[in-house]
């Protein structure tokens, strides 16, 4: 609970407002061509919570609500909106906020007992970006090695 209002606002601004601005930027072009794919990134942490990351988990749950609401709003324009929920990913970018013990616990909680890397997400994102997902919208695909099942 030791999160400042400023830190809270910053995380929500990046993770929630950022989606709004990106979607607003591409919408006119997608509407004009009556086709488009918006793919948002959530987190599997929304299924089980994550202590000391209240602002992050809240913002990533917001991604799901945004995705579903926007899917309903722009579907008539031929635009699909979906989200991916990765688990704790060994990308190098989160080394400062995720100590080695946290990665070890993430691996232990998975059915697939190894680290998750950015490359583990590319197949899912490519599927969502392809014509193979043209009749799929408002969905969340969980890619975390089986740590969270819903």
Regions found by a protein language model. Name each.
Residues 110-121, 132:
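A conserved structural motif in NAD(P)-dependent oxidoreductases
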Residues 48, 125-126, 137-150:
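Short C-terminal tail/terminal secondary-structure segment
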Residues 43:
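Residue(s) in the substrate-gating loop at a strand-loop-helix junction
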Residues 28, 72-76, 134:
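Alpha-helical segment proximal to the catalytic Tyr-Lys
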Residues 4-9, 94, 106:
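Substrate-binding pocket helix/loop in short-chain dehydrogenase/reductase
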Residues 3, 49-57, 69:
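Active-site loop-to-helix junction immediately N-terminal to the catalytic Tyr of the SDR YXXXK motif
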Residues 23, 59, 67:
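Active-site helix of classical SDR
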């Amino acid at each position: 609970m030791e999160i400042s209002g400023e830190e809270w606002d910053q995380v929500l601004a990046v993770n929630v407002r950022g989606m709004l601005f990106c979607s607003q930027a591409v919408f006119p072009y997608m509407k004009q061509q009556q086709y488009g794919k918006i793919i948002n990134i959530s987190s599997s942490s929304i299924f089980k919570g994550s202590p000391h990351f209240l602002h992050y988990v809240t913002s990533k749950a917001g991604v799901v609500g945004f995705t579903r609401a926007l899917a309903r709003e722009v579907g008539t324009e031929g635009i699909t909106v979906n989200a991916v929920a990765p688990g704790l990913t060994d990308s190098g970018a989160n080394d400062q906020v995720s100590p080695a013990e946290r990665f070890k616990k993430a691996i232990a909680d998975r059915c697939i007992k190894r680290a998750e890397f950015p490359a583990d997400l590319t197949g899912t994102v490519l599927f969502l970006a392809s014509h193979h997902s043209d009749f799929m919208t408002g969905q969340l695909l969980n890619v975390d090695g089986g740590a969270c099942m819903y």
